[in-house]
């Protein structure tokens, strides 16, 4: 279920404050955050935000296509190594 339109999009206040300060100064720094549930706003375009994935911070460069999505969508928490190939050890030999 999506968030109520009445409430508006969620973004952590401290993250938005840091973005606005950097925009005023005209700087582009990597901003560390643990707030995966924050919605990406248009003010964030062009910044790199390091989103925590559970063990490290993954740098995410914000582009126009990402506006409206959550930060956590771009920092995967699980590593997919592909399906296991069948080998002699994994297959049962019927006798």
From Swiss-Prot:
GO terms for biological process: ribosomal small subunit assembly; translation. InterPro entries: Ribosomal_uS19, Ribosomal_uS19_bac-type, Ribosomal_uS19_CS, Ribosomal_uS19_SF. Keywords: Ribonucleoprotein, Ribosomal protein, RNA-binding, rRNA-binding. One of its GO terms (molecular function) is structural constituent of ribosome. One of its GO terms (cellular component) is cytoplasm. NCBIfam families: rpsS_bact. Belongs to the universal ribosomal protein uS19 family. Protein S19 forms a complex with S13 that binds strongly to the 16S ribosomal RNA. This is Small ribosomal subunit protein uS19. It comes from Clostridium kluyveri (strain ATCC 8527 / DSM 555 / NBRC 12016 / NCIMB 10680 / K1).
């Amino acid at each position: 279920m999506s968030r109520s339109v009445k409430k508006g999009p969620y973004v952590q206040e401290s993250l938005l404050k840091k973005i606005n300060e950097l925009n005023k100064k005209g700087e582009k720094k990597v901003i560390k955050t643990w707030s995966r549930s924050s919605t990406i706003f248009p003010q964030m375009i062009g910044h790199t935000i390091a989103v925590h994935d559970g063990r490290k911070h993954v740098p995410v460069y914000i582009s126009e296509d990402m506006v409206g999505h959550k930060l956590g969508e771009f920092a995967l928490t699980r590593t997919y190594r592909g399906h296991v190939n069948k080998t002699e050890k994994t297959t049962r030999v019927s006798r």
